[in-house]
Design a protein with these regions (language model features):
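Bacterial N-terminal signal peptides
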Residues: 7-16
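Positively charged n-region of N-terminal signal peptides that target proteins for export
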Residues: 1-5
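Interaction-mediating elements
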Residues: 21-292
Length: 292
């Protein structure tokens, strides 16, 4: 074989080995992008070297689009998660390594002015009727005087969603408004949209009769009862011995009928037994006052 005939294969092998593993892959195009091999932050005034190391460690080893603006937003989010709500990312720079590698390894640096450390001054809830303000505040992980973290705000909204869902309010939504003060505190207001309270509709279990009868016997949420969104997970966990291996709520079809405030469920244990249509979602008609 002529020596040059093996060159294309060699190039293919080199290209294959140049594709680095990403700890987390955030690229929109898997055949491009960058791999952050090192990351330094400069310009901060009050943050310790230990805390900066934790922040840079969140991005080192991960892959991103070759977009300094996007990385700047991610870096800003790291600061906001630690209470630096007005942090300003002044510059993000890349120093590339091997230009032929996919993704391209880079050393990243960022110039950041962190600003003041914000704490929560107060949290208020508006338009909540079904659940008391005290109960909502108890479920929210961000407490008065604690560092204002955007991650905790997001987890708090999810916690309220679970709480409302457990009481049948499946259309719950919260509009969040945050207002910073000159004394480095943040006031948080959540405007609650509860929607209708749903009740349990029909339960269909798609399985052989013996299995379906046993599973139905274990179902403790009767038709007409307030629908608890969290009950299905508890039911699946408690009946693992009756359910197929790896069964999750993704195998359950749900249809929410908003006008009648009912939820029909269909548990598909054996797809071969499935002869009925999927439960339908029926939306409520929007009123003239409804801004949506």
């Amino acid at each position: 074989m002529r020596p040059w005939a093996s060159i294309p294969l060699a190039l293919l092998l080199c290209a294959a080995f140049s594709r680095a593993d990403c700890a987390q892959d955030h690229r929109s195009n898997k055949n491009a992008g960058i791999l952050v091999t090192d990351f330094t932050i400069s310009g901060t005034q009050t943050i310790s070297a230990t805390e900066l190391a934790r922040m840079t460690g969140n991005l080192i080893g991960s892959c991103f689009d070759d977009d300094p603006e996007e990385l700047g937003e991610r870096i800003r989010a790291l600061f906001q998660d630690r209470g630096y709500f007005t942090a300003e990312v002044k510059h993000v720079g890349f120093k590339p390594g091997d230009p032929l590698a996919i993704p391209k390894p880079v050393t990243m640096d960022a110039d950041v002015a962190e600003g003041p450390l914000y704490k929560l001054a107060e949290i208020t809830f508006v338009d909540n009727h079904a659940i008391s303000t005290d109960r909502l505040r108890q479920a929210f992980p961000l407490k008065k005087g604690s560092i204002f973290s955007r991650t905790k705000v997001a987890s708090g909204i999810d916690a309220l969603r679970r709480l409302y869902g457990s009481r049948g309010f499946l259309d719950y939504n919260a509009v969040v408004d945050s207002e910073p003060s000159s004394n480095a505190t943040m006031s948080l207001k959540l405007s609650i949209q509860e929607g209708p309270q749903y009740h349990m509709g029909k339960l269909e279990i798609v399985a052989a009769k013996e299995v379906a009868d046993r599973l139905r016997l274990q179902w403790k949420l009767p038709e007409g009862a307030v629908y608890d969104y969290t009950y299905l997970d508890k039911y699946i966990s408690a009946n693992r011995d009756l359910l197929p291996s790896g069964f999750t709520r993704d195998r359950v079809q749900a249809g929410a009928d908003c006008p009648h405030a009912l939820v029909d469920l269909k548990l598909i244990i054996d797809a071969a037994e499935d002869k009925s249509p999927q439960p339908k979602n029926v939306a409520c008609e929007k009123t003239k006052e409804d801004p949506k």
